[in-house]
């Protein structure tokens, strides 16, 4: 890079104490870790593309936290961020991912045949099944930091790759900027499209700059395999369908994802991955598999049971409302998914969802009959 980050150099005219953010009222992982000492140490560092510690933490400074959800409070701007600012990221990663250590190795397993069961979740209770992940393309900076030209290059590369898919994956790309308001809203309501960038986390991190330039959605002809381009990550890959056949959803996810990865590799742009962090993504909460395997499941009785939260925790699952994070459950329908991302494989994480949801549906059926479920409460997984 011929010139340094002049904006950051200018900030160095002020003492660290004068630049250090006020985090006294914050409830996020970044605020727990970033002391004045650490800020002093990191503030004149930058990645090869010019991302600084102030860029890393901005979203967490502007969003003190959520009363119920401990937000992460920081983002990576490029692949090197996790290395250059490791003294900030490592404790956050450990905190967020159950004590994951800087020396730990992540494992990847995208062989769908290793998943046991998953094709027999009761569709009267499990209304839909979905598996998603994110991927970052090597050689480009990440959405909080990329330039317009980079973002457009990522879109061009992605569309070329996706348009070469055939068979069950044959599909079409729909750029956001050529969609009507109505088309866009319909896709959002169908859970096919990312929301417009109103989330303060997206806005403060810089991910929503130039919206909707170079953003879009690609999906196969029967809308069961989707790829979001240039939202929070370069790519978000999603496999979904109505009902409870998680086995089929996961098969399509693995096969489609590996086809896409192959095409990018051949084009000389593999995905960002390393042995320690697995797949490198914008938000530290998604490192590892980046995978969220979830179902919409109806639990009218179990959700009112005093041990509902404890059961979820023991099964290593988390719940969200029907519309995703920050929403309420409508008609006792919850979005239940794996809590882990880093340190265990894709197959292991989806297995936890399949086994855990199956058990919770059995509990729900017992409660419907007025029977006790005390003997079914699982041990901590």
Curated annotation (Swiss-Prot):
The keyword Transferase applies. It is found in: Cytoplasm. It is an enzyme of class 2 (transferase). Its main location: cytoplasm. Its EC number is 2.7.3.2. GO terms for biological process: phosphocreatine biosynthetic process. The modification Phosphoserine is found at residues 164, 178, 199, 372. Residues 11-98 form the Phosphagen kinase N-terminal domain. GO terms for cellular component: cytosol; extracellular space. Gene3D superfamilies: ATP:guanido phosphotransferase, N-terminal domain, Glutamine synthetase/guanido kinase, catalytic domain. GO terms for molecular function: ATP binding; creatine kinase activity. ATP binds at residues 128-132, 191, 236, 292, 320-325, 335. It catalyses: creatine + ATP = N-phosphocreatine + ADP + H(+). Keywords: ATP-binding, Cytoplasm, Kinase, Nucleotide-binding, Phosphoprotein, Transferase. CDD domains: creatine_kinase_like. The modification Phosphothreonine is found at residues 166, 180, 313, 322. Residues 125-367 form the Phosphagen kinase C-terminal domain. Reversibly catalyzes the transfer of phosphate between ATP and various phosphogens (e.g. creatine phosphate). Creatine kinase isoenzymes play a central role in energy transduction in tissues with large, fluctuating energy demands, such as skeletal muscle, heart, brain and spermatozoa. Dimer of identical or non-identical chains, which can be either B (brain type) or M (muscle type). With MM being the major form in skeletal muscle and myocardium, MB existing in myocardium, and BB existing in many tissues, especially brain. Belongs to the ATP:guanido phosphotransferase family. This is Creatine kinase M-type. The gene is CKM.
